[in-house]
């Protein structure tokens, strides 16, 4: 098909993922500007791309990777600059709503610099690769409300580790 050029609602679109209804969810990094992070959602159709919601500000820094639970109810972005993860509800129409007013749904620790994330097939666990301290933070996902409960941190990864997959 013909490529479509669509300006982003937020500045510096970085991570992206499609939910089960075909909505495009995008992290807006704002050039890594302090406490400017956000996410936006878009409707994608043969006629083009249109904004559903956003930018929905999370007051965190440098949102990076985006993951969505299998049921399509929750989405998360890793905030590299502030060492945490922000969670959002995805409403049926694709509208995003931030879980926590402060945007901190799960902390990966000071200096952790979370980058890549993955959710296992049952959407029970979220794994976050932390580039600042070469660890993986593991969280249990609350399947009713989307909250994140820290389970463990795995250390000893090689410096420069990138990419993450979960089953």
Show which residues each predicted segment covers:
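Beta-rich, blade/repeat-based domains predominating
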Residues: 8-24, 36, 57-73, 105-125, ...
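Structural motif
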Residues: 34-40, 84-87, 135-138
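C-terminal hydrophobic structural anchor segments
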Residues: 86, 94-133, 138
């Amino acid at each position: 098909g013909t490529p479509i050029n669509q300006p982003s609602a937020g500045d510096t679109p970085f991570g992206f993922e499609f939910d089960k209804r075909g909505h495009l969810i995008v992290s807006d990094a704002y050039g890594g500007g302090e406490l400017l992070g956000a996410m936006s959602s878009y409707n994608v159709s043969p006629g083009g791309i249109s904004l559903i919601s956003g930018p929905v500000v999370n007051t965190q820094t440098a949102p990076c990777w985006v993951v969505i639970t299998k049921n399509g109810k929750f989405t998360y972005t890793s905030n590299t600059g502030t060492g945490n993860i922000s969670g959002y509800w995805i409403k049926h129409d694709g509208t995003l709503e931030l879980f926590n007013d402060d945007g901190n749904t799960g902390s990966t620790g000071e200096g952790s610099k979370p980058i890549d994330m993955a959710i296992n097939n049952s959407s029970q666990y979220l794994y976050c690769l932390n580039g600042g301290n070469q660890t993986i933070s593991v969280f249990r996902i609350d399947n009713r409300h989307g909250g994140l409960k820290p389970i463990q941190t795995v250390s000893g990864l090689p410096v420069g580790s990138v990419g993450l997959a979960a089953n």
